[in-house]
A protein has these predicted regions:
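Positively charged, small/polar-rich N-terminal and surface patches that mediate targeting and assembly
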Residues: 1-105
Length: 105
């Protein structure tokens, strides 16, 4: 089974932690890391925006990708949330098995 990393940025630490908890509680990800704040600079509606956000990294399986995306879109405060999948070359077998086990309901 293929293991995926899913990354997003969420404004506000409390919001980021709550979203991460919901996704892990629903077993759409085996774990989530809410990282220290980052300043995001981007264009939105023809205006340059600057916002403090918290990067969040989820570890999941390919079979849960669509469900995780759907849940993240529903919970995320942005209309068009960043949801990216950094490419993994390989995952250590014991850790991969843990992710697979912990994403089973």
């Amino acid at each position: 089974m293929k293991i995926l990393i899913v990354q997003t940025n969420i404004p506000g630490q409390d919001v980021a932690v709550k979203i991460a908890e919901i996704i892990v509680e629903k077993r759409l990800a085996a774990c989530a890391n809410v990282l220290s704040e980052a300043t995001s600079i981007y264009w939105w509606e023809k205006k340059l925006q600057r916002e403090i956000e918290h990067p969040v990294v989820f570890k999941t399986t390919e079979s849960l990708k669509d469900s995780l995306i759907k849940e993240l879109r529903a919970l995320h405060p942005h209309d068009v949330p960043e949801i990216v999948f950094p490419k993994l070359e390989d995952v250590e077998e014991t850790y991969a098995n843990l992710i697979i086990q912990e994403t089973k309901a």
